[in-house]
Amino acid sequence: NSDVVEKMRVNGNDGKYAAVIKTDDPQDVMVNIKKEGHAFNSTLITKEELSSNKSINAKDLAVKELKEGEAYTINDILYATASDELSDRAQFILRQFARFLKENEELEILIQGHTDNEGNAAKNLALSDRRAKKVKQYLIQMGVAEERLSAKGYGQTQPKVPNTSETNKAQNRRTDFVIK
């Protein structure tokens, strides 16, 4: 669990980058993309993905300029159907997000919880609220000041993609953050 494995420069013209990361023992690798004045973005590449000896595409990570009122999805903070439990992967990413927030003390955020359209709309609204509050509590445990955070669930009212497949539904069970 080292803090920084590699730092790399991104091509200013097209935004492309490549990295070779060598480890003695297979372990999960967190890829964080940072740029001053831009939103947090990261992805976790599991040791299973790394041990496949295939080239890994870091899932089209991009940094977006921070704008008040705009929603940003925290990659890989996804949930199982009807669950508000934070997976180990989600907790790992939230620790990195907490670090980002502590480095950017001026930011106040609204944490938004979302669900797919499976089940009852009222239950989904309550579930999404529990998800958002669970993320807020975790960030507070990681040292982010409570007064900088608020949390709200939106249920199934704001899908990111149509709920037409299991893959899409998984993407809609997500957490976004909005700059206040």
Where are these regions (language model features)?
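Periplasmic peptidoglycan-binding/tethering modules of Gram-negative envelope proteins
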Residues: 2-108
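Periplasmic OmpA-like peptidoglycan-binding domain that tethers envelope proteins to the cell wall
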Residues: 104, 110-180
